A protein has these predicted regions:
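Conserved catalytic core of the tyrosine transesterase superfamily
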Residues: 1-300
Length: 300
């Protein structure tokens, strides 16, 4: 096989410099492309210019056989379509076989979100007498208060946080910035963490940096670290919830819209480029539906 590593490196540079993609997006693109190279090796395809539409159909069939979600397969198609388009632009290829491939129809699933009882229990689990407990509580409160992505949360620096106006400057997808407010609960827990827990964690190994959230060694907290925090907290409950960090974002949007917030405002807070991305949250909770039913049905 040709030296595909050079092509991938050029594409990564293109994503970062010309398209201004975030590191998270760039890593996803690179991962999808590397996995496609594995498929090429398995099928004995030596060069990218040898890829045919039939090869792509075989690749997609294998993905479907592994029962991956449609969103996962769509992402892979988008990544490879962009990569081959780039190679076409660089005149390495004469045509883009992925241009013939349509994206799978999106599944209309209701996003998973927390009910208030679940949230309250989750918020009660952190031990506020410890530095890590203070960090965990501040982290959970900020995720729910702002609806920011976990990657955005891990990128927050001290100078991005305005404790006077209770706002945070968020660096979103495509390096687009937005200000997002947070409330009194998040303010209180952030203040405790900043004045106590964070300092203690940084001093453990004489670490000094300006990232807001830190790990147990005092280094910057990663997205994997956030998942670990949630997994450890859920072990302390009797619930069998399968939770992931993005559920705070789903919950933020759902609770705002159920509470009467307008769609455009929620779109801006979430940092969505398209309103259609926000409309997925216009579902209503079962509790909200039941209250509406009991209030209005004549034989309820």
């Amino acid at each position: 096989m040709e030296n595909v590593k050079n092509f991938l490196n050029l594409f990564v540079d293109y994503l970062q410099i010309e398209r201004n993609c975030s590191q998270y997006t760039t890593v996803n693109y690179a991962t999808d492309i590397k996995e496609f190279y594995v498929f090429m090796n398995e099928e004995g395809i030596g060069e990218l210019r040898d890829i045919t539409y039939q090869d792509i159909r075989l690749y997609l069939t294998k993905l479907h056989q592994k029962e991956f979600a449609r969103t996962y397969i769509s992402r892979k198609i988008s990544s490879l379509r962009s990569y081959f388009k780039f190679l076409l632009r660089e005149k390495y290829l004469q045509e883009n076989p992925f241009s013939l491939v349509s994206l799978p129809k999106k599944e209309q699933r209701i996003p998973n979100f927390f009910y208030e009882d679940d949230l309250n229990e989750l918020f009660s689990l952190s031990d506020l007498s410890t530095p890590l407990g203070q960090r965990d509580q501040a982290l959970l409160e900020l995720l729910y208060a702002t609806g920011i992505r976990v990657s955005e949360c891990c990128d927050i620096r001290l100078q991005d946080l305005d404790m006077y106006l209770d706002t945070v400057l968020v660096n979103g997808k495509g390096k687009k910035q937005r200000y997002v407010p947070f409330g009194s609960f998040a303010h209180e827990k952030l203040k405790l963490y900043l004045e106590d827990g964070r300092i203690t964690l940084l001093n453990k190994q004489n670490n000094h940096h300006d990232m807001l959230f830190v790990n147990h060694r005092g280094g910057p907290l990663t997205t994997r670290g956030v998942r670990h925090v949630l997994n450890e907290l859920i072990k302390k409950t009797s619930k069998t919830l399968h939770i992931h960090p993005h559920m705070f974002r789903h919950t933020f949007a759902t609770h705002l819209l159920n509470g009467g917030a307008d769609l455009r405002s929620v779109q801006e807070l979430l940092g969505h480029a398209h309103l259609s991305s926000t409309q997925v949250y216009t579902h209503v909770s079962k509790e909200h539906l039941r209250k509406s039913y009991l209030s209005h049905h004549p034989r309820a």
